[in-house]
Structure formats: structure tokens, C-alpha cells
Swiss-Prot record:
<keyword id="KW-0221">Differentiation</keyword>
<feature type="region of interest" description="Disordered">
    <location>
        <begin position="116"/>
        <end position="192"/>
    </location>
</feature>
<protein>
    <recommendedName>
        <fullName>Neurogenic differentiation factor 1</fullName>
    </recommendedName>
</protein>
<dbReference type="GO" id="GO:0003700">
    <property type="term" value="F:DNA-binding transcription factor activity"/>
</dbReference>
<dbReference type="GO" id="GO:0030182">
    <property type="term" value="P:neuron differentiation"/>
</dbReference>
<dbReference type="GO" id="GO:0007423">
    <property type="term" value="P:sensory organ development"/>
</dbReference>
<keyword id="KW-0539">Nucleus</keyword>
<dbReference type="GO" id="GO:0014014">
    <property type="term" value="P:negative regulation of gliogenesis"/>
</dbReference>
<comment type="function">
    <text>Acts as a transcriptional regulator whose activity is required for several aspects of motor neuron fate specification, including cell division patterns, proper spatiotemporal expression of fate-specific markers, and normal axonal morphology and pathfinding. Involved in regulating glial specification.</text>
</comment>
<dbReference type="InterPro" id="IPR036638">
    <property type="entry name" value="HLH_DNA-bd_sf"/>
</dbReference>
<keyword id="KW-0238">DNA-binding</keyword>
<dbReference type="Pfam" id="PF00010">
    <property type="entry name" value="HLH"/>
</dbReference>
<dbReference type="GO" id="GO:0005634">
    <property type="term" value="C:nucleus"/>
</dbReference>
<feature type="compositionally biased region" description="Low complexity">
    <location>
        <begin position="139"/>
        <end position="163"/>
    </location>
</feature>
<dbReference type="GO" id="GO:0061564">
    <property type="term" value="P:axon development"/>
</dbReference>
<dbReference type="GO" id="GO:0070888">
    <property type="term" value="F:E-box binding"/>
</dbReference>
<dbReference type="Pfam" id="PF12533">
    <property type="entry name" value="Neuro_bHLH"/>
</dbReference>
């Protein structure tokens, strides 16, 4: 901010400007406190909680978006992802540090979450195949077919509850028909 030449202003005008600036600063400070409090509350519900390293604002929002996406896909497909599939979903667009924390939390190797480098093409003669760390595009969370006619996901990760929480499903025939239709229509797309 440029210094203002105050020699042309009356003392009353200078005083009014200072008061307005102090009020504006107070409003901005209150707005930032509200935003920070909301982000702290959000951090309690995402997989990397405050028990771990505190995430930046943007990492918190990205992880929350990915977590919502993962939960939504679990509900749509009615399947529980493998830890690696779940980690891929959560790590989408996150920094390497956050990705490493997720890998540790979900007990997968961090290198399995790395996108394939452009040099993999030259070192791997089967470069036309998918990189082993990435699931095939348009695959569902789980490639295994249901063992029974009523097989909703058994558990999902809840950061506020250390143990997994059971998901509910229905074994009524209408539910089974709807489940089987949706499990073949809804697929999970991964973005490398």
C-alpha cells in the first residue's frame, strides 16, 4: 500500500480514514477466523485428521472433495474399494506429502500412488499396457463379483471412528435387482 500524503487533509478526515481502515481490518480478521474455524471442523471429518500433520487449506479442500467422491461412488456401486483403489481416489490432485500420509494411513506403498513418469515408456517394453500402480479406466471399485445376491459394502473408513462402520443394505428382491443394474452401469474412473 502506498503512503498517503496527509498534509492536504484535515485531522478529522485523517481520523475517519484510520477508523474505516481499523474496522475493515477487523472485519477481514473475523472473516479469516470464521474460515479457519470451518476448515478446522472439516479436518475432523476427512481421513487425515488433526492427529496427523495439519493440512493446508487447499489440501484440506481437495481431500474433502476426493473423500466425498469416494463415499459417493461406494454408495452408487454398493462395493467397497480395495485400500489401493481407495488411496488412488483420495490422493487425486494432492501433494506428494499428503499422498504419502494417505498411503501410510491406508497401509499401501506410496510408490503405488505415484503417476507413471514419462520415462517409464522408454524403460518398459510393454509401455502400451497400463502402469501397474493405476487401475484400469472405467473399472468399478472392486472387480470381484458379489458372492451372494445381497452384497453391499461391509465397511467404510470413518476418521471419527477408529474402527470401520458397517454399511446397511437390503436383501429384498427390488433392492437386489437395482443393485445389480447399478453395479454394472456405474463405473469408477481414475484420473492419473
Amino acid at each position: 500500500m502506498r503512503p498517503t500524503d496527509t498534509s492536504n487533509f484535515a485531522p478529522a478526515e485523517i481520523s475517519k480514514r484510520k477508523v474505516r481502515r481499523v474496522k475493515a481490518n477487523g472485519r477481514e480478521r473475523a472473516r479469516m477466523h470464521g474460515l479457519n474455524n470451518a476448515l478446522d471442523m472439516l479436518r475432523e471429518y476427512i481421513p487425515i485428521t488433526t492427529q496427523h500433520q495439519k493440512l493446508s487449506k487447499i489440501e484440506t479442500l481437495r481431500l474433502a472433495r476426493n473423500y466425498i467422491d469416494a463415499l459417493q461412488r461406494m454408495l452408487q456401486t454398493n462395493e467397497q474399494p480395495t485400500p489401493l483403489e481407495y488411496a488412488h481416489t483420495l490422493a487425486n490432485g494432492l501433494s506428494q506429502t499428503t499422498t504419502n500420509m494417505l498411503a501410510n494411513l491406508l497401509q499401501v506403498q506410496p510408490r503405488q500412488l505415484l503417476p507413471p513418469s514419462q520415462f517409464d515408456i522408454f524403460s518398459d517394453p510393454s509401455h502400451h499396457q497400463l502402469h501397474p500402480s493405476h487401475p484400469p479406466p472405467h473399472s468399478s471399485f472392486s472387480s470381484s463379483s458379489p458372492s451372494s445376491s445381497c452384497s453391499p459394502p461391509q465397511y467404510y473408513y470413518s476418521p471419527t471412528q477408529p474402527s470401520a462402520a458397517p454399511l446397511q443394505g437390503s436383501c429384498d428382491p427390488q433392492y437386489q435387482q437395482m443393485y445389480h443394474q447399478h453395479s454394472h452401469q456405474n463405473t469408477f474412473n481414475y484420473s492419473p
